[in-house]
Amino acid sequence: GNVQHKFLVMHFTAGSSAQESVEWLASPKAKASAHVVIGRDGSITQLVPFDRVAWHAGASSWEGYEGLNQYSLGIELDNAGKLTRQGDRWLAWFGTEYDNSDVIEAVHKFETQPAGWEVYTPEKIDSALKVAGLLIDEYGLGEVIGHEDIAPHRKCDPGPAFPMSSFRARLMGRAEDQATVYETTTDLNIRSGP
């Protein structure tokens, strides 16, 4: 069916590479899809036309809307997501080890214990900003949200390593980026005394 464009939903793939995620999401076995996958290097792959429903949100709700697939576009960011500490190493669920410099330790907003989270590369964030900005402009999307926001306690993406606040501000506040112009006057009539 056709999407009723209202929201942009940000995800992480929880996979080992963008190519693997693209291949998986393009497979009927996946029973899931997304409009776009963005790689660690900033590469962009479109999987589903932007006017068609993609199966990225699952059981979800937001601001009175149920089943967000019908109302949103989905961007998947190539990212391992939540990592597990084993000694001095960080491991993804699929076995890949991540260097400490590629991981932040943080508590997810719906959890109480810290975990490791793969950081998002600047290239990935830049590409996501470009794609998201174009989609917001073209389809009039009113809000950028995380999968974790529309499916709390079921999903944890894009997670605490994703700079959602600044990402949203850069996208949704673009019209307000122009500096405010203040005019001052020198025609003040200031008196002292009675």
Predicted region positions:
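Active-site-adjacent loop/helix surface patches within enzyme catalytic domains
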Residues: 1-142
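Short, surface-exposed, charged/polar-biased interaction segments
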Residues: 31, 65-68, 149, 156, ...
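Histidine-centered divalent-metal-coordination microenvironment in nucleic-acid enzymes
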Residues: 72-76, 151, 159-161
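Short, small-residue-rich loop/turn micro-motifs
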Residues: 77-79, 148, 186-188
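Acidic/histidine-rich, metal-coordinating catalytic segments
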Residues: 138-154
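Short, low-complexity, polybasic intrinsically disordered segments
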Residues: 153-177
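SH3-family beta-barrel domains
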Residues: 173-189
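SH3/SH3-like (including bacterial SH3b) beta-barrel domains
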Residues: 192-194
